[in-house]
Structure formats: C-alpha cells, structure tokens
Amino acid sequence: MVSPLVINITYLLLMLSIVLSFVRLARGPSLPDRVVALELIATLVVAVIGVHAIDTGIAAFLDIAIVLALTAFIAAIGFARFLERGGPRDD
C-alpha cells in the first residue's frame, strides 16, 4: 500500500498542474495553445483518476481513465485534421 502522505502530495501536485493548465487555457494566445492546454487537462484528469484508483483500490476507475484518455486522443486527432484543412488558428 502506498503511504497516505505520498498520495496527498501527488493529489496536490496534480491539482496545481490542473490550475496552471486552466490559466493557460484562458490566456491563450492562439487556438492551438488552448487545445494543447485542454489536452493537458484531460491527461492530468486521467492521472488523478489513476491515483484515486490506487488510493481506493477500486480497479473500475482505471476503465474510466482509459475511456477518457481515448476520448482526448480522438479529440486531438480531430483538431489536427481541422487545422490541416485550413481552419482558423487565431495567430
């Protein structure tokens, strides 16, 4: 079992990363920057779910994390195709 101190520090660092990613999402300056920040937030949420699964010992949370990771990956592919076809970049 993992030490509660390690779990709490991990939660704290992940939450700090999510807050900083939200700042990047709000400030921009361009659309690709915002999408990268959104992808980072999705990845950090997957990490939080993974840590929660370790903390509680419930493996079903890992299924949720996998679905969220796959959804974020598909969204990134869709955005890349949008930019490839000449979508606005707000540069």
What are these regions, as identified by a protein language model?
Residues 1-27, 31, 36, 49-62, ...:
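Flexible extramembrane loops and terminal tails that flank transmembrane helices
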Residues 12-22, 41-44, 70-73:
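Hydrophobic alpha-helical transmembrane segments of multipass integral membrane proteins
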